[in-house]
Amino acid sequence: MAEVTAAQVKELRERTGAGMMDCKKALNEVGGNMDKAIDFLREKGLAAAAKKEGRIAAEGIVEAYIHGGGRIGVMLELNCETDFVANTDGFKQFARDIALQIAAAKPRYLAKADVPEEELEHEKNILRAQALNEGKPEKIVDKMVEGRISKFYKEVCLLEQEFVKDPDKTINDLVLEKTAKIGERIVIRRFTRYEMGEGIERREEDFAAEVMKEMNR
């Protein structure tokens, strides 16, 4: 039987919201088959997020966050299934936390799939050139690039970013946790971030660091 990889466990966790050990056990039980592992977790009542994937999340709120007298602004649409959940303090606080994350960490895209192919290829070409300039053997360069591109995703994709308040979790982890806890599908649909003077040459001011301090109070 093929050995279950960490990447498989991570993917199963992202798709189901189940714990790491439960995901590893499920994959071992079914010989590494992802679909069968999801079914295994559902049968055990452990795949909270997977059971809700097909449900429509059309309610929710638009959260607006303004920092530092109007120097940074964020608008975020966070969806759920019912207006009851949308009006709870917990859901509103979650939207606030995500808006603060966007203000502090400056993501440009929501998910990996949103990164334009030409930008991704451009980044890979730069990483490939860097590896070659470091004197790395050409036969391992592509593997190195794939490893380094994951860091790029963590910088530019909101769902891949480490949560500023708890770096052991990604934003995607938080969404899955909230889905399991609330019992409804939760979706970050879209966001926009503005920073005063963005694109204009001016003296350096780290507004994002200020937001991080506010989040950790």
From Swiss-Prot:
- Keywords, comma-separated and alphabetical: Cytoplasm, Elongation factor, Protein biosynthesis
Quote the gene name from the UniProt entry: tsf
Chief localisation class: cytoplasm
Q: Where in the cell is it found?
A: Cytoplasm
Q: What does this protein do?
A: Associates with the EF-Tu.GDP complex and induces the exchange of GDP to GTP. It remains bound to the aminoacyl-tRNA.EF-Tu.GTP complex up to the GTP hydrolysis stage on the ribosome.
Output this protein's name: Elongation factor Ts
Provide GO CC annotations from the record.
cytoplasm
Please give the InterPro entries that the UniProt record associates with this protein.
EF-Ts_dimer_sf, Transl_elong_EFTs/EF1B, Transl_elong_EFTs/EF1B_dimer, Transl_elong_Ts_CS, UBA-like_sf
Source domain of life? Bacteria
| Region spans: Involved in Mg(2+) ion dislocation from EF-Tu | 82-85
Q: Which PANTHER family match?
A: ELONGATION FACTOR TS, ELONGATION FACTOR TS, MITOCHONDRIAL
Which Gene3D superfamilies does the UniProt record give?
Answer: 1.10.286.20, DNA helicase RuvA subunit, C-terminal domain (1.10.8.10), Elongation factor Ts, dimerisation domain (3.30.479.20)
What family does this belong to?
A: Belongs to the EF-Ts family.
Fetch the HAMAP family from UniProt.
EF_Ts
GO-annotated molecular function: translation elongation factor activity
